[in-house]
């Protein structure tokens, strides 16, 4: 299987040329958002437009926000790249900047999705004539609200809507004056869930192939995206009480307001009745291979890491990362996908799990 779903082609429907001409007529710099269901050719359209606009002398930027099927590495981020030469796949582009989402589906992460696209759009506008924004295929249910929030935040000058049967109408209502509806190419290919997973596996593997283990002192960096270090550490009396009540061995515990959050190992088998409004717990066995974002002071992601271990007593965190220059890391942000460096995904965590 090829490592990318979308490649450059000139064999496109006639309306693509009309889209190029419309973009050409827009006041610059201009933002163009591309929306559509899964497997409607959004990324193929993005690649075509970028190459065509480059040929016409425009400076082009691409924002890849399809976090589960990224062309611009790595997955679980929104990425910005500037196009300086003709290319055939988003894989050919080198990212200029990223925004960390930390998972491969927008569910539970609407805020991050909107903020990420907005921040990268603002950055891209400083250095380009046209910003092309490729989006996820989440267009139904809560996906309608996500797309509308993105439109409200980014304020695109043009929306290109790849549509089969008017399925984008709930998203586009009120934005008809800035929308061009495009037909879905007959050549658009459907990908199964297993094919998508295999594509992602290869991208994870490629991203982490030259990684090394580094250690961070938790006193030197901000840790976010988790309750692990919020509130105050529980005392020995509280720890012993919780261990007796629930037959746990508590590795780490915090009191956050009136609630407890603990990392635990079961000391014995059997059911436990735990009021999660009072005590939230996380299994120590899962506190590894969690995706981490390495974040700079501006809130951008300089690269990813994989959590290998945490020494709570010594306040050390062991991270596998391909990032060589770590001097600008001000924050480590926890994601919600567990993945190994060979690309094997171990599952998604609920946002509230950590």
Swiss-Prot record:
Q: What is its EC number?
A: 2.7.1.78
Q: Which GO terms describe its molecular function?
A: ATP binding; ATP-dependent polydeoxyribonucleotide 5'-hydroxyl-kinase activity; ATP-dependent polyribonucleotide 5'-hydroxyl-kinase activity
Question: Where does the chain bind ATP?
Answer: 36-43
Q: What sort of enzyme, by top EC class, is this?
A: transferase
Q: Which reaction does it catalyse?
A: a 5'-end dephospho-2'-deoxyribonucleoside-DNA + ATP = a 5'-end 5'-phospho-2'-deoxyribonucleoside-DNA + ADP + H(+); a 5'-end dephospho-ribonucleoside-RNA + ATP = a 5'-end 5'-phospho-ribonucleoside-RNA + ADP + H(+)
Output the Gene3D superfamilies linked to this UniProt entry: P-loop containing nucleotide triphosphate hydrolases
Entries under SUPFAM superfamilies matching the protein: P-loop containing nucleoside triphosphate hydrolases
Q: Which UniProt keywords apply?
A: ATP-binding, Kinase, Nucleotide-binding, Transferase
Protein name (Swiss-Prot/TrEMBL):
Polyribonucleotide 5'-hydroxyl-kinase PYRAB01840
Output the Pfam families linked to this UniProt entry: CLP1_P
Q: What does this protein do?
A: Polynucleotide kinase that can phosphorylate the 5'-hydroxyl groups of both single-stranded RNA (ssRNA) and single-stranded DNA (ssDNA). Exhibits a strong preference for ssRNA.
- Cofactor names: a divalent metal cation
Q: From which source organism is this entry?
A: Pyrococcus abyssi (strain GE5 / Orsay)
What InterPro entries does UniProt report for this protein, alphabetically? Clp1/Grc3, CLP1_P, P-loop_NTPase
């Amino acid at each position: 299987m090829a490592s990318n779903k979308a490649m450059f082609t000139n064999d496109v429907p006639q309306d693509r040329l009309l889209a190029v001409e419309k973009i050409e007529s827009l006041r610059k710099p201009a933002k163009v958002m591309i929306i559509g269901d899964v497997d409607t050719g959004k990324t193929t359209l993005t690649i075509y437009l970028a190459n065509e606009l480059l040929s016409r002398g425009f400076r082009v930027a691409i924002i890849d926000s399809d976090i589960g099927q990224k062309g611009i590495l790595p997955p679980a981020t929104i990425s910005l790249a500037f196009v300086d030469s003709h290319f055939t796949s988003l894989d050919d582009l080198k990212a200029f900047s990223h925004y960390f989402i930390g998972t491969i589906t927008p569910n539970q992460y609407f805020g991050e999705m909107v903020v990420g696209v907005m921040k990268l759009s603002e950055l891209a506008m400083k250095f380009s004539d046209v910003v092309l924004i490729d989006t996820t295929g989440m267009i139904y249910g809560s996906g309608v609200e996500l797309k509308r929030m993105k439109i409200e935040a980014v304020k695109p000058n043009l929306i290109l809507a790849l549509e089969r049967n008017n399925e984008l109408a709930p998203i586009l209502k009120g934005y008809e004056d800035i929308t061009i509806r495009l037909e879905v190419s007959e050549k658009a290919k459907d990908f199964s869930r297993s094919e998508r997973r295999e594509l992602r596996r290869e991208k994870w593997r490629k991203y982490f192939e030259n990684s090394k283990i580094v250690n961070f002192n938790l006193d030197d960096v901000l840790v976010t995206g988790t309750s692990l270090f919020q509130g105050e550490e529980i005392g020995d009396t509280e720890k012993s009480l919780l261990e007796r009540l629930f037959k746990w061995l508590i590795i780490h515990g915090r009191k956050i307001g009136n609630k407890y959050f603990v990392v635990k190992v079961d000391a014995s088998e059997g059911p436990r009745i735990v009021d999660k409004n009072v005590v939230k717990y996380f299994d120590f066995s899962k506190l590894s291979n969690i995706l981490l974002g390495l974040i700079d002071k501006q809130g951008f992601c300089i690269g990813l890491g994989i959590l290998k271990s945490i020494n709570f007593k010594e306040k050390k965190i062991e991270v596998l990362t391909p990032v060589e220059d770590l001097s600008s890391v001000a924050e480590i942000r926890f994601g919600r996908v567990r993945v190994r460096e060979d690309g094997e995904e171990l599952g998604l965590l609920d946002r509230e799990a950590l």
